[in-house]
Amino acid sequence: MKTETRTEIEAAVFRRLVNHLDSRKDVQNLDLMNLSGFCRNCLAKWYSAEAVDRGEEITVDSAKEIVYGMTYGEWKDRYQK
């Protein structure tokens, strides 16, 4: 498989995962962490770290907006139990 194709597939899988998590707002981060060892916040931290490794300055808060589809504070107010 070509590197470019693999990268495109991985990006599509990431978007699907983010969309899936967005459709399951009933699943709390704590539940994700307890069951799988990662949560939405972890995805945001990884996103930010990978961007920085590639010379892009994306804060964790900005990455959370990508993962949550809104600010983290807004998501917490609406969906965190």
Task: For the regions a language model picked out, list residue spans one by one.
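Domain-level signature for proteins that mediate thiol-based redox and metal-cofactor handling
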Residues: 1-81
